[in-house]
Curated annotation (Swiss-Prot):
It comes from Photobacterium profundum (strain SS9). The keyword Isomerase applies. This is Putative N-acetylmannosamine-6-phosphate 2-epimerase. CDD domains: NanE. It comes from the Bacteria. Its EC number is 5.1.3.9. Belongs to the NanE family. The lineage of its organism: Bacteria, Pseudomonadati, Pseudomonadota, Gammaproteobacteria, Vibrionales. Converts N-acetylmannosamine-6-phosphate (ManNAc-6-P) to N-acetylglucosamine-6-phosphate (GlcNAc-6-P). GO terms for molecular function: N-acylglucosamine-6-phosphate 2-epimerase activity.
Length: 235
C-alpha cells in the first residue's frame, strides 16, 4: 500500500461517507448538481464521497479534497450484478479521479470475476472496496487483498429488504479482521453511530442525505399516518 492509499484510509477512519447519488432521471440528476451536493457534504464534515458515473466523478473531483469512492451502475441482461461489473469501468473510474473503486462482490452470475476486478483496481493504484451481502463474500474478498469490505448489499440480493441495517454482519467481519464500511439502511444519525459501535471502520449514508424525493416521501408517509390516526379517533 502506498502513502496516498494510506492517507485515504486514514481520512475515512471512523468518519462517514455521503453517497451523492440522486434519483435516476430525477430533477437533481446532473453532474453539476451532484458536484454541488458533494461540496455541501464536505462542508458538513463528511470524510469521503461515494459517486456513481464517470461524468459525475469528473465533475466532483476538482471541488473536493476528500477520498472519492467511485462506482458505475449498469443494468445487465443476464446478471443481477449492477455495481462496476466490467474491467473497463475500473479504468474509467481511475481516469475520472476515483481514489477507491467499489465493486459488487456477491457470489452471483457476473460478466467479470471478482478476482479480475480486484486485480484491475490494484493495478491502477486505487483502493478496492467490496460491496458484499454475506460474511463469506466479505471474507473471500479480504483474503484477496481488498482493503475495504462493505455491508452494502446485505438484504438486497433476494427476498424482502429488512428495515434495519445488518449490524451482526458488521460485527462479525470486524472480529475477523476486516476493515468494514457500514452501508445499507443507515438513515438516521443514531443508526450511523451504532455502526461505529458495532465495529465499522466508516459508515456510508445515502438516501437520508442526498435523495430529496425519498426524504420527502418519509415525511409525507408519517404525516398521512398521523392524519389517519386522528380521523379514526374522531370517528
Amino acid at each position: 500500500m502506498n502513502k496516498t492509499q494510506e492517507n485515504a484510509l486514514k481520512a475515512l477512519q471512523q468518519g462517514f461517507v455521503a453517497s451523492c447519488q440522486p434519483v435516476d432521471d430525477g430533477p437533481m440528476d446532473s453532474p453539476m448538481i451532484v458536484a454541488a451536493m458533494a461540496q455541501a457534504a464536505v462542508a458538513g464534515g463528511v470524510a469521503g464521497i461515494r459517486i456513481e458515473g464517470i461524468e459525475n466523478v469528473k465533475a466532483v473531483r476538482p471541488h473536493v479534497n476528500v477520498p472519492i469512492i467511485g462506482i458505475i451502475k449498469r443494468d445487465l441482461e443476464h446478471s443481477d450484478v449492477r455495481i462496476t461489473p466490467f474491467i473497463e469501468d475500473v479504468y474509467a473510474l481511475k481516469a475520472a479521479g476515483a481514489d477507491v473503486i467499489a465493486i459488487d462482490a456477491t457470489h452471483r452470475v457476473r460478466p467479470t470475476s471478482v478476482e479480475d476486478l480486484i486485480d484491475a483496481i490494484h493495478s491502477v493504484g486505487c483502493l478496492a472496496m467490496a460491496d458484499c451481502s454475506t460474511y463469506d463474500e466479505g471474507m473471500y474478498c479480504q483474503a484477496r487483498g481488498v482493503q475495504i469490505i462493505g455491508s452494502t448489499l446485505s438484504g438486497y440480493t433476494g427476498g424482502p429488504v429488512p428495515a434495519e441495517p445488518d449490524f451482526d454482519l458488521i460485527t462479525r467481519l470486524k472480529q475477523a479482521g476486516c476493515r468494514v464500511m457500514a452501508e445499507g439502511r443507515f438513515n438516521t444519525p443514531e443508526l450511523a453511530g451504532k455502526a461505529i459501535e458495532a465495529g465499522a471502520f466508516c459508515v456510508t449514508v445515502g438516501s437520508a442525505i442526498t435523495r430529496v424525493e425519498h426524504i420527502c416521501s418519509w415525511f409525507q408517509a408519517e404525516v398521512e399516518h398521523a392524519h389517519q390516526a386522528q380521523s379514526e379517533a374522531v370517528a
